[in-house]
Amino acid sequence: ADITKLRKMTGAGMMDCKNALTESEGDFDKAVEIIRKKGQAVAAKRSDRETSEGCVLAKSTGDYAAMIALKCETDFVAKNADFVALTQAILDAAIANKCQTIDEIKALPMGSGTIADAIVERSGITGEKTELDGFNFVSGPCTAVYNHMNKNQLCTIVAFNKVCDEKIAHEICMQIAAMNPIAIDEAGVPEAVKQEEINVAIEKTKAEQVQKAVEAALKKAGINPAHVDSEEHMESNMAKGWITAEDVVKAKEIKTTVAAEKAANLPQAMIENIAKGRLGKFLKEVCLLNQESIMDPKKTVAEVLKAADAELTVADFKRFTLRAE
């Protein structure tokens, strides 16, 4: 009976509970402490290990939604029913208390200790480093969540400015999961990100303009640009008889002189206009409201929301995944 009670309280395996009760000479409280210390020892020993697997869950209670990730080392542990149940219990506690930080969650009571203790105990049971991560929350008049394919790997949570149709809310959650926007609209994209995109676009446009000029000059000289686009190609194409050594010398001279001349005389206004166009394309891809709807590609997300309710918009969203993208 004590073994069953100890298993229920700690989640430890039958043999661990039996050994703890034997070691404590039947003292139940001491047995609980033994299991807890074992968990702490395992956790400390594996503190430098990488936790690339885990379980991610999200839940909404009307005006508040949250997500949490309980991370571990292997897929085998992540899929274990007890591990998933612990993740769900932690999320339920966070939801019930409308937590705003991960430290708040760790301090909440669970079992005979706190959630932080429960995580350490789970580490002792599985023998793997276990940690809490990925906590995010949103709040508003209406919230929705999406657990991607119920595989506990990717979740999204969304808050709307007013109560909205459940189907629309679900579609927006799926949109965020699929298209991974970084902001609701352009105003939410940091200026540093925009400037970096402009800088990259300018350099890319300059390089393209220089390349066009070089290719035009090579063609005018009777040389196929594809035959001289690298040292390796020049050597192999000479061996094949497609170009001569004189062609190579001429091509190298053209590439050097034309590239330098074009780079020194690039039309700045044109370059900036092209770069701005590329920034616009980037913002369309990364801003949620600007994106094409995955459910109706002829419309943007903003248009889908407006069609449902002229005043409806997204107030906040969060996305978390265990997988590299």
What is the predicted role of each segment?
Residues 1-325:
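N-terminal assembly/interaction segments in proteins that build large macromolecular machines
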